Curated annotation (Swiss-Prot):
Pfam families: Ribosomal_L12, Ribosomal_L12_N. SUPFAM superfamilies: ClpS-like, Ribosomal protein L7/12, oligomerisation (N-terminal) domain. Keywords: Ribonucleoprotein, Ribosomal protein. Belongs to the bacterial ribosomal protein bL12 family. Homodimer. Part of the ribosomal stalk of the 50S ribosomal subunit. Forms a multimeric L10(L12)X complex, where L10 forms an elongated spine to which 2 to 4 L12 dimers bind in a sequential fashion. Binds GTP-bound translation factors. One of its GO terms (biological process) is translation. This is Large ribosomal subunit protein bL12. It comes from Dictyoglomus turgidum (strain DSM 6724 / Z-1310). It comes from the Bacteria. NCBIfam families: L12.
Length: 125
């Protein structure tokens, strides 16, 4: 398999498959796909040191739009939230709405990938 064939195969994958591929590559090669924090230029002499920025540890997953495939999105919402059919339908029909709040970044990304795989528009805050 050459480079172009690999790229084409990746282009044809669904979001959830890409997430699984990245995890497998991280485990196989002992690396992280997280973007490194870019170093900001050295402060100018006499400039006050900037306060350290706290990294966010909990995230909210917001369903912005269910898309054209509402039934499949509804099933995923029920699976994620444990809501009944009526409650999940009301949530999906009244977007934008939070699906899950106070979750880890990894869990938020997994939820987003599942919903986007079914055609939903999702935001992580």
């Amino acid at each position: 398999m050459n480079k172009e064939e690999i790229i084409q195969a990746i282009k044809e994958m669904k979001v959830i498959e890409l997430v699984e591929l990245v995890k497998a590559l991280e485990e196989e090669f002992g690396v992280s796909a997280a973007m490194p924090v870019a170093a900001v230029g050295a402060p100018v002499a006499g400039a006050a040191a900037a306060a350290p920025v706290e990294e966010k540890t909990t995230f909210d997953v917001i369903l912005k739009d269910a898309g054209a495939n509402k039934i499949k999105v509804l099933k995923v919402v029920r699976e994620i939230t444990g809501l009944g059919l009526k409650e999940a339908k009301d949530l999906v029909d009244s977007t934008p709405k939070p699906i899950k709040e106070g979750v880890s970044k990894q869990e938020a990304e997994e939820i987003k990938a599942k919903l986007e795989a079914e055609g939903a528009v999702v935001e992580i805050k």
